[in-house]
């Protein structure tokens, strides 16, 4: 999964350069939300459907990673690039820590190992993920110089 993630991270940034960073990140975040909404419920179909859904979800989770990092660095004031990267890393790793915990809490609250529990658990993740596109739509960060799709 990490190899797929790394490849999609790099390819995702190339797409951001070609089509516009904000537009690409918004699209990928929305696809990730849709994937999260369905992922837990797919486990009731078959093992291979679940594996495929997990791989697709993983690819889209990573597809905006490099674009977000490049956007953070490219948008930072020159004298604050280090502090910006520190905050970027802190927020990213905090989400990576808190996300699985909240999913686990939701699983426990919903009764554990049922398809419904997993579906609600991942739906909860999707709801939290709405913060990303909402922030992009409200803050409207500029695309970076060199992004061909920039408006």
Residue ranges and their predicted role:
Residues 2-10, 96-97:
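Residue-level signature of mid-helix packing/kink "hotspots" within the transmembrane helices
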Residues 9-21, 107-108:
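Helix-to-loop junctions at the C-terminal end of transmembrane segments
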Residues 20-68:
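C-terminal transmembrane helical hairpin of 12-TM major facilitator-type secondary transporters
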Residues 67-75:
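Intracellular helix-loop hinge segments at the cytoplasmic ends of transmembrane helices
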Residues 75-111:
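A late C-terminal transmembrane helix in Major Facilitator Superfamily
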Residues 105-128:
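A membrane-interface helix-boundary motif in multi-pass transporters
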Residues 139-151:
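Intrinsic disorder in cytosolic terminal tails and internal cytosolic loops
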